[in-house]
């Protein structure tokens, strides 16, 4: 696309960053001074009844700055990057038609990538192939299947944990159906996003500061009733640890504690560690992200001013 046609496209803003970096607070401040509407880009915030452990904006924050694509799925339901792209594009079109600018805020980098670049042409799920993979897993264990994926697609294997049966079986399924690896196919993009996008990433200047923020927030969640929230989900009886919702950081560790697998102290330790690992993965994505402007989360006023300098001109 040439520069002239790109300038004529409608505007959009991405506000990305690792967990606990202050994205939501900045987005809410920006909505006060810019003609923007917020769209959540978070694979955990989509779930109803999962508010504390996901750091979902509270009622006052949502009144000041409504977020779209929150609470759109029950924790028992799946939600893919393709689902997100479809829903986000519909919301963006609605916002643009109303003469406002979509501000997409969150930390699910796969969703941002799917939206920006389009989706690769992956084969549809095949129940017969999936059943065969699950039978193999029952006989050999997921660790053995992960080793199989390591031989077929080492790049995907490095990204997928042996204890993540959903993603592991999908990577194998794609290969068995198409004869091509998940890595090969995901390098083929679909339709690019038809917007002129201004991209920002917010994070603390040092890893130590981010780790401190993560630990503090986890303890704040515990003090706010996180255990009771997960116990309510556990009591339903239809949820389990193979679901993406219950595999969310914090929830998986609290679930293990409720099941009696680990102590409370171990749950806290693992919850903080898994959140740090999530932040590390998010930062790895962002460091390789093209066209992003970095903002310092330790100086929110300056971050807001930097966004306004860039976006204020396009919002006029």
Swiss-Prot record:
EC number: 2.5.1.75
Entry binding sites for substrate: 19-24
Keywords per UniProt: ATP-binding, Magnesium, Nucleotide-binding, Transferase, tRNA processing
Chemical reaction(s) catalysed: adenosine(37) in tRNA + dimethylallyl diphosphate = N(6)-dimethylallyladenosine(37) in tRNA + diphosphate
Renumbered residue ranges of the record's region Interaction with substrate tRNA: 42-45, 166-170, 247-252
Cofactor: Mg(2+)
The keyword Hydrolase belongs to this UniProt entry's keyword annotation: no
GO molecular-function term, one example from the UniProt record: ATP binding
Gene Ontology biological process: tRNA modification
The UniProt record lists the keyword NADP: no
Function: Catalyzes the transfer of a dimethylallyl group onto the adenine at position 37 in tRNAs that read codons beginning with uridine, leading to the formation of N6-(dimethylallyl)adenosine (i(6)A).
Quaternary assembly: Monomer.
Name by which UniProt lists this protein: tRNA dimethylallyltransferase
Source species of the chain: Salmonella typhi
